[in-house]
């Protein structure tokens, strides 16, 4: 007599080698329950674990801002909240932290982390988070009865690692998904829709202007050709006045690859990757109108600071840095700032090794004058 066969054993999914195709196989550190050691392995290799965020230039930011107990601080671009958490620790007891962000997906998570941090430090009422673009900071301070200004203001203009590593957000070429790149998915048009309506010259212009991209002409030509192919393959959409299918992240990747077609050297491969980063960054800046928001923030910044207040801004793009440098210099000459950074502050080699995303970060700071020049409000 033989035993009846049991149910067939369920085979576990095979890992696809050193170059897996599926996101969850390649970025196993996102699943700490199944792969508890992966996060530490990634950190030890000098990379940032997917789905997490390591704040950049923390020591340098704290040195520039010098937050002290009892002060009012503003994190104008909260993100994950790494910088805000360190600032909060230094303004307590008696301090107050106001934190802003436009991302409706990440803001509640960061708010919960900060609230817990404040409670652990003994003052659960010390933090307030607000869904607001930093361009409206001056108005927000009035609403919060802080018209006299804040003692400390930080703005970190980089995209957070959580946004980059979330496949559904369309921020990264790592995932073949509809091209979105909106900080606030409920506002404006996704990038894949906006680019479909742009002319080749318009695409080339913003890639040069917002991305400093040397291969802008070739990338723009390839993207425009993709747009034309979409129109040609979707006659019913056009006849019925329906929206065309959105461009995907893979369309942008393919456009960059076409711009480098025929170049196979190691240098060309590294240059292609840099172009890919700059192209996605330029599209993100365009879609979110980031430079206009930055200009508005810089214009109001001196009037958001209390006398002697300190501001620090982290940039990740030369166009952003030029604007900050110019605004700080103009404010110094107008007597609005008492001091500004003489040189840009960069991440140390040690930090760049541990956190590659810090490599492009630039920090500039300014100190508000004790009083406004006559006639300036």
Residue spans for each PLM region:
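S-adenosyl-L-methionine-dependent methyltransferase catalytic core, i.e., the SAM/SAH-binding region
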Residues: 1-377
């Amino acid at each position: 007599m033989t035993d009846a066969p049991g149910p067939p054993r369920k085979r576990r999914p095979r890992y696809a080698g050193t170059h897996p195709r599926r996101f969850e196989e390649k970025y196993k550190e996102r699943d700490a329950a199944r792969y508890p050691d992966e996060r530490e392995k990634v950190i030890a290799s000098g990379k940032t674990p997917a789905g997490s965020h390591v704040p950049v230039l923390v020591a340098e930011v704290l040195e520039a801002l010098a937050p002290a107990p009892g002060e009012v601080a503003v994190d104008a671009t909260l993100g994950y909240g790494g910088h805000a958490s360190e600032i909060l620790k230094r303004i307590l007891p008696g301090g107050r932290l106001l934190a802003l962000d436009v991302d409706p997906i990440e803001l509640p998570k960061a708010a919960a982390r900060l609230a817990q941090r404040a409670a652990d430090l003994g003052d659960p009422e010390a933090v307030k988070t607000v869904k607001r673009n930093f361009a409206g900071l001056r108005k927000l301070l009035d609403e919060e009865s802080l018209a006299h200004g804040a003692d400390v203001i930080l703005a970190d203009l980089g995209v957070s690692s959580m946004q980059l590593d979330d496949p559904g957000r369309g921020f990264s070429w790592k995932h073949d998904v509809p091209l979105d790149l909106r900080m606030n998915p409920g506002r404006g048009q996704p990038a894949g829709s906006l680019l479909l309506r742009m002319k080749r010259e318009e695409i080339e212009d913003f890639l040069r202007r917002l991305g400093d991209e040397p291969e802008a002409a070739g990338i723009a030509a390839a993207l425009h050709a993709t747009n034309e192919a979409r129109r040609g393959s979707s006659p019913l959409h056009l006849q019925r006045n329906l929206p065309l299918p959105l461009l995907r992240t893979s369309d942008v990747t393919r456009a960059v690859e076409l711009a480098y077609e025929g170049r196979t050297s190691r240098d060309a491969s590294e240059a292609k990757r840099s172009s890919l980063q700059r192209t996605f960054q330029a599209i993100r800046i365009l879609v979110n109108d980031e430079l206009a928001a930055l200009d508005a923030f810089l214009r109001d910044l001196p009037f958001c600071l209390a006398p002697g207040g300190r501001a620090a801004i982290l940039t990740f793009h030369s166009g952003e840095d030029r604007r900050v440098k110019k605004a700080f210099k103009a404010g110094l000459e107008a007597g609005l700032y008492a001091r500004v950074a003489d040189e840009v502050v960069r991440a140390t080699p040690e930090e760049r090794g541990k956190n590659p995303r810090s490599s492009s970060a630039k920090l500039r700071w300014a100190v508000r004058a004790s009083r406004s020049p006559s006639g300036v409000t």
